């Protein structure tokens, strides 16, 4: 969605990688701090509510807002766009896997090692990374992709809330 405005230069890809790595760290920090300061029960209640927040925001779309900034300060514009369109959902999703592992571990004293959830999460991420450019991107227009994302995210949010 940003490539038509900025192109596919290495600086665009590097900036996006930087943003997503930083957002991943923010998600992990939120998980760690929340569990440490709030405990499992309060953190589960907070996250079960927070996971719904991205669905209340407007759909993800890159507009020409700030197009003048894009030509003068493309990196600043790109960081603004990714932060405002995918920042919150990404941070929430990044924090969900470690939280689910902790919830699983503390839900039952007889619970076994929760790290199989981490492996399942990585396998799902890899499958999505492979499927998107081969199936979704060429076959579905952007608006349908966004609709599928919102429906899928709603299902994930409901399942996470049920776990919390």
Where are these regions (language model features)?
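Alpha-helical transmembrane segments of multi-pass membrane proteins
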Residues: 1-164
């Amino acid at each position: 969605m940003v490539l038509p405005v900025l192109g596919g230069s290495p600086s665009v890809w590097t900036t996006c990688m930087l943003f997503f790595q930083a957002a991943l760290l923010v998600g992990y920090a939120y998980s760690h701090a929340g569990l440490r300061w709030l405990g499992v029960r309060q953190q589960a209640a907070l996250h079960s509510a927070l996971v719904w927040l991205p669905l209340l925001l407007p759909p993800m779309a890159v507009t020409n807002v700030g197009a003048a900034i894009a030509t003068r300060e493309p990196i600043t514009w790109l960081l603004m766009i990714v932060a405002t369109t995918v920042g919150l959902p990404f941070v929430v999703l990044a924090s969900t896997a470690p939280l689910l592992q902790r919830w699983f571990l503390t839900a039952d004293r007889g619970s076994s090692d929760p790290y199989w959830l981490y492996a399942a999460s990585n396998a799902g991420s890899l499958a999505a990374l492979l499927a998107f450019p081969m199936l979704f991107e060429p076959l579905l227009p952007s608006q349908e992709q966004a609709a599928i994302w919102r429906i899928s995210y709603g299902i994930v949010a409901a399942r996470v809330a049920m776990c919390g």
